[in-house]
Amino acid sequence: MFEIHPVKKVSVVIPVYNEQESLPELIRRTTTACESLGKEYEILLIDDGSSDNSAHMLVEASQAENSHIVSILLNRNYGQHSAIMAGFSHVTGDLIITLDADLQNPPEEIPRLVAKADEGYDVVGTVRQNRQDSWFRKTASKMINRLIQRTTGKAMGDYGCMLRAYRRHIVDAMLHCHERSTFIPILANIFARRAIEIPVHHAEREYGESKYSFMRLINLMYDLVTCLTTTPLRMLSLLGSIIAIGGFSIAVLLVILRLTFGPQWAAEGVFMLFAVLFTFIGAQFIGMGLLGEYIGRIYTDVRARPRYFVQQVIRPSSKENE
């Protein structure tokens, strides 16, 4: 049996992108929640290339008296998961909690995650209760969760909720992974010996709009399919075999009908031939698209460009800035 080590220091990692309206409330509530833990803590806020006043507000928060806030400024927008990985590379706690900046997942849930992690879990996930999102967001989330469960075999209920807790060794393992497309909840579960989910409250978004547009959700689904498994390639081979067998069967059937009913019937079968042709063409384009996604991933990984570039790190005034 592995020895269970109590949590001594908590690091809260929060990616920020154009969230200037919610930042004061976010900082206040997160600080209050962390103070109630009775443990050492730090709050890492990563500005993911915001175009509003978010970065300036983060710097001011880090420089405030008795601040526990570490501000990490990226030079441009790299996406939510890359920003979180940037935060992971600067944490000093032995339990790391991720949280969205939109306050839909209340920071007041942090003590519950810490208490559950203290029971010896490597990963503590959450399931949003009474989700306050639009019908489209809920439907897309259900589809993504089912896709992940089928491809990974991990029966986690809500991969889209970023309010999660990770033990330090899980974060260190993720930092050793070099793929450019990273979906953190899934990657963490690959390394976790013990994982659990707990229900959490979900509030309406009070400030701004969701940063996940329709196209970004589509891109996310492509990322999940191509970075998790090669199953689509196997399915593509199976689909190709089925189409080939079907095409051969139809060809044999057409010959038999031609011999049975004569050339008059053959003229009327032109549209069926076109249908078969378009079926093959459509299947080829689907296959080429999937192969292109995988080849694109390989190309991106081979170039080995960094996931992000940290422009500046501002630590509390008692510590030296980087």
UniProtKB/Swiss-Prot annotation:
Residues 257-269 are periplasmic. One of its GO terms (cellular component) is plasma membrane. It is found in: Cell inner membrane. Residues 1-235, 291-322 are cytoplasmic. Pathway: Glycolipid biosynthesis; 4-amino-4-deoxy-alpha-L-arabinose undecaprenyl phosphate biosynthesis; 4-amino-4-deoxy-alpha-L-arabinose undecaprenyl phosphate from UDP-4-deoxy-4-formamido-beta-L-arabinose and undecaprenyl phosphate: step 1/2; Bacterial outer membrane biogenesis; lipopolysaccharide biosynthesis. It catalyses: UDP-4-deoxy-4-formamido-beta-L-arabinose + di-trans,octa-cis-undecaprenyl phosphate = 4-deoxy-4-formamido-alpha-L-arabinopyranosyl di-trans,octa-cis-undecaprenyl phosphate + UDP. The keyword Transmembrane helix applies. It is an enzyme of class 2 (transferase). Keywords: Antibiotic resistance, Cell inner membrane, Cell membrane, Glycosyltransferase, Lipid A biosynthesis, Lipid biosynthesis, Lipid metabolism, Lipopolysaccharide biosynthesis, Membrane, Transferase, Transmembrane, Transmembrane helix. Coiled coil: none annotated. It is a multi-pass membrane protein. Its main location: membrane. Its EC number is 2.4.2.53. GO terms for molecular function: phosphotransferase activity, for other substituted phosphate groups; undecaprenyl-phosphate 4-deoxy-4-formamido-L-arabinose transferase activity. Catalyzes the transfer of 4-deoxy-4-formamido-L-arabinose from UDP to undecaprenyl phosphate. The modified arabinose is attached to lipid A and is required for resistance to polymyxin and cationic antimicrobial peptides. PANTHER family: UNDECAPRENYL-PHOSPHATE 4-DEOXY-4-FORMAMIDO-L-ARABINOSE TRANSFERASE, UNDECAPRENYL-PHOSPHATE 4-DEOXY-4-FORMAMIDO-L-ARABINOSE TRANSFERASE-RELATED. This is Undecaprenyl-phosphate 4-deoxy-4-formamido-L-arabinose transferase. It comes from Shigella dysenteriae serotype 1 (strain Sd197).
